Amino acid sequence: TKEERHLALYRKYRPQEFKDVLGQENALKTLENSIKQNKISHAYIFSGDRGTGKTTVARIFAKEIGSSRDDIFELDAASNNGVEDMRILIENTQASTFGSKYKIYILDEAHMLSKSSFNALLKTLEEPPANVIFILATTDRHKIPATIISRCQEINFISPSIKILEENILRISKKESRKIDNDSVNLIAKQGKGSFRDSLG
Protein backbone atom coordinates (compact mmCIF):
# COMPACT_ATOMS: atom_id res chain seq x y z
CA THR A 1 0.00 0.00 0.00
CA LYS A 2 0.96 3.66 -0.30
CA GLU A 3 1.16 3.88 3.51
CA GLU A 4 3.61 0.95 3.65
CA ARG A 5 5.74 2.43 0.85
CA HIS A 6 6.18 5.80 2.51
CA LEU A 7 6.83 4.16 5.89
CA ALA A 8 9.52 2.00 4.26
CA LEU A 9 11.09 5.15 2.76
CA TYR A 10 10.96 6.91 6.14
CA ARG A 11 12.63 3.96 7.87
CA LYS A 12 15.25 3.60 5.14
CA TYR A 13 16.39 7.20 5.63
CA ARG A 14 15.74 7.50 9.36
CA PRO A 15 18.67 9.51 10.83
CA GLN A 16 21.30 7.35 12.54
CA GLU A 17 23.37 10.17 14.08
CA PHE A 18 22.64 13.55 15.67
CA LYS A 19 24.18 15.35 12.68
CA ASP A 20 21.56 13.78 10.38
CA VAL A 21 18.60 15.13 12.38
CA LEU A 22 17.00 18.24 10.87
CA GLY A 23 15.15 21.05 12.61
CA GLN A 24 15.66 20.03 16.26
CA GLU A 25 18.73 22.10 17.12
CA ASN A 26 17.64 23.00 20.68
CA ALA A 27 16.72 19.42 21.60
CA LEU A 28 19.98 18.07 20.17
CA LYS A 29 22.10 20.75 21.85
CA THR A 30 20.61 19.90 25.26
CA LEU A 31 21.22 16.17 24.79
CA GLU A 32 24.72 16.59 23.36
CA ASN A 33 25.69 18.88 26.24
CA SER A 34 24.41 16.39 28.80
CA ILE A 35 26.62 13.72 27.22
CA LYS A 36 29.70 15.98 27.06
CA GLN A 37 29.27 17.12 30.66
CA ASN A 38 28.32 13.63 31.84
CA LYS A 39 25.09 15.02 33.32
CA ILE A 40 22.68 12.43 32.03
CA SER A 41 19.22 12.35 33.61
CA HIS A 42 17.55 9.13 34.72
CA ALA A 43 14.33 10.13 32.97
CA TYR A 44 13.37 12.31 30.01
CA ILE A 45 10.14 13.42 28.43
CA PHE A 46 10.38 13.96 24.67
CA SER A 47 7.25 15.88 23.71
CA GLY A 48 6.11 17.07 20.30
CA ASP A 49 3.79 16.36 17.40
CA ARG A 50 3.85 13.03 15.59
CA GLY A 51 6.60 12.51 13.05
CA THR A 52 8.97 15.11 14.54
CA GLY A 53 11.72 12.61 15.37
CA LYS A 54 11.21 11.82 19.06
CA THR A 55 11.78 8.06 18.84
CA THR A 56 14.57 8.50 16.29
CA VAL A 57 16.44 10.92 18.57
CA ALA A 58 15.83 8.63 21.57
CA ARG A 59 17.51 5.77 19.69
CA ILE A 60 20.45 7.96 18.63
CA PHE A 61 20.85 9.26 22.20
CA ALA A 62 20.91 5.67 23.51
CA LYS A 63 23.60 4.80 20.98
CA GLU A 64 25.62 7.95 21.74
CA ILE A 65 25.84 7.10 25.45
CA GLY A 66 27.13 3.66 24.57
CA SER A 67 24.09 1.43 25.00
CA SER A 68 24.17 -1.66 22.83
CA ARG A 69 21.10 -2.85 20.95
CA ASP A 70 20.51 -5.51 23.62
CA ASP A 71 20.21 -2.81 26.29
CA ILE A 72 17.69 -0.63 24.43
CA PHE A 73 14.04 -1.52 25.00
CA GLU A 74 11.13 0.06 23.17
CA LEU A 75 7.58 -0.23 24.42
CA ASP A 76 4.46 1.02 22.67
CA ALA A 77 2.51 2.34 25.64
CA ALA A 78 -0.68 2.50 23.57
CA SER A 79 -0.87 -1.31 23.38
CA ASN A 80 1.07 -2.17 26.57
CA ASN A 81 -0.54 0.28 28.97
CA GLY A 82 -1.65 -2.01 31.79
CA VAL A 83 -0.10 -2.14 35.25
CA GLU A 84 1.06 -5.72 34.62
CA ASP A 85 3.01 -4.57 31.54
CA MET A 86 4.66 -1.88 33.67
CA ARG A 87 5.47 -4.34 36.49
CA ILE A 88 7.22 -6.64 34.01
CA LEU A 89 9.17 -3.69 32.60
CA ILE A 90 10.19 -2.52 36.09
CA GLU A 91 11.29 -6.05 37.04
CA ASN A 92 13.39 -6.06 33.89
CA THR A 93 15.18 -2.88 35.02
CA GLN A 94 16.64 -4.81 37.96
CA ALA A 95 18.56 -7.17 35.67
CA SER A 96 22.14 -6.28 34.79
CA THR A 97 23.02 -4.80 31.40
CA PHE A 98 24.51 -6.69 28.46
CA GLY A 99 27.81 -4.89 28.92
CA SER A 100 26.50 -1.33 28.42
CA LYS A 101 26.74 1.42 31.02
CA TYR A 102 23.00 2.12 30.71
CA LYS A 103 19.80 0.27 29.93
CA ILE A 104 17.43 2.53 28.02
CA TYR A 105 13.65 2.22 28.09
CA ILE A 106 11.86 4.16 25.35
CA LEU A 107 8.12 4.43 26.05
CA ASP A 108 6.32 5.57 22.90
CA GLU A 109 2.94 7.27 23.30
CA ALA A 110 3.66 7.45 27.03
CA HIS A 111 0.49 9.48 27.70
CA MET A 112 -1.51 6.30 26.94
CA LEU A 113 -0.32 4.56 30.11
CA SER A 114 -3.05 3.81 32.65
CA LYS A 115 -3.18 5.59 36.01
CA SER A 116 -1.96 2.46 37.82
CA SER A 117 0.92 2.12 35.33
CA PHE A 118 1.96 5.72 35.99
CA ASN A 119 1.86 5.04 39.75
CA ALA A 120 4.10 1.99 39.33
CA LEU A 121 6.49 3.99 37.12
CA LEU A 122 6.54 6.86 39.62
CA LYS A 123 7.95 4.61 42.35
CA THR A 124 10.82 3.63 40.06
CA LEU A 125 11.45 7.26 39.04
CA GLU A 126 11.62 8.24 42.73
CA GLU A 127 14.40 5.70 43.32
CA PRO A 128 15.82 4.97 39.87
CA PRO A 129 18.37 2.17 39.38
CA ALA A 130 21.77 3.75 38.69
CA ASN A 131 22.13 2.23 35.24
CA VAL A 132 18.60 2.81 33.90
CA ILE A 133 17.30 5.68 31.76
CA PHE A 134 13.65 6.17 30.83
CA ILE A 135 12.63 8.18 27.78
CA LEU A 136 8.91 8.95 27.62
CA ALA A 137 7.91 10.06 24.13
CA THR A 138 4.55 11.77 23.87
CA THR A 139 2.36 13.84 21.58
CA ASP A 140 0.13 14.76 24.56
CA ARG A 141 2.28 16.05 27.39
CA HIS A 142 -0.72 17.40 29.34
CA LYS A 143 -1.99 13.84 29.82
CA ILE A 144 1.13 12.85 31.75
CA PRO A 145 0.77 13.33 35.54
CA ALA A 146 2.64 16.29 37.05
CA THR A 147 4.32 13.91 39.52
CA ILE A 148 5.97 12.10 36.57
CA ILE A 149 6.87 15.32 34.72
CA SER A 150 8.59 16.76 37.81
CA ARG A 151 10.98 13.80 37.87
CA CYS A 152 11.94 14.03 34.20
CA GLN A 153 14.05 16.37 32.12
CA GLU A 154 11.85 17.79 29.39
CA ILE A 155 12.99 17.99 25.78
CA ASN A 156 10.62 19.70 23.35
CA PHE A 157 10.48 18.75 19.68
CA ILE A 158 9.16 21.36 17.28
CA SER A 159 7.34 20.67 14.03
CA PRO A 160 9.75 21.21 11.13
CA SER A 161 9.18 24.18 8.84
CA ILE A 162 8.15 23.77 5.19
CA LYS A 163 11.73 24.73 4.24
CA ILE A 164 13.23 21.93 6.35
CA LEU A 165 10.72 19.39 5.00
CA GLU A 166 11.61 20.49 1.45
CA GLU A 167 15.29 20.03 2.24
CA ASN A 168 14.59 16.51 3.50
CA ILE A 169 12.44 15.57 0.48
CA LEU A 170 15.13 16.82 -1.94
CA ARG A 171 17.85 14.93 -0.06
CA ILE A 172 15.92 11.66 -0.19
CA SER A 173 14.78 12.03 -3.81
CA LYS A 174 18.43 12.59 -4.76
CA LYS A 175 19.47 9.42 -2.92
CA GLU A 176 16.63 7.54 -4.62
CA SER A 177 17.79 8.95 -8.01
CA ARG A 178 14.41 10.56 -8.61
CA LYS A 179 14.01 13.94 -10.23
CA ILE A 180 11.38 16.17 -8.71
CA ASP A 181 10.48 19.77 -9.57
CA ASN A 182 10.37 22.56 -7.00
CA ASP A 183 6.59 23.00 -7.15
CA SER A 184 6.07 19.31 -6.36
CA VAL A 185 8.58 19.48 -3.50
CA ASN A 186 6.72 22.45 -2.03
CA LEU A 187 3.33 20.75 -2.38
CA ILE A 188 4.57 17.51 -0.76
CA ALA A 189 6.15 19.48 2.11
CA LYS A 190 2.87 21.34 2.73
CA GLN A 191 0.87 18.11 2.70
CA GLY A 192 3.29 16.68 5.27
CA LYS A 193 1.81 19.11 7.84
CA GLY A 194 4.95 19.40 9.95
CA SER A 195 5.79 15.69 9.97
CA PHE A 196 8.93 14.15 8.46
CA ARG A 197 7.14 10.81 8.28
CA ASP A 198 3.99 12.13 6.57
CA SER A 199 5.94 14.25 4.07
CA LEU A 200 7.36 11.08 2.52
CA GLY A 201 3.92 9.85 1.49
Q: How would you label these PLM feature ranges?
A:
Residues 1-154, 160-164, 172, 182:
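P-loop/Walker A NTP-binding region and its immediately flanking N-terminal helices
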Residues 105, 170, 174, 185-191, ...:
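C-terminal helical "lid" of AAA+/P-loop NTPase domains
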Residues 156-157, 189:
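A ubiquitous short alpha-helical element
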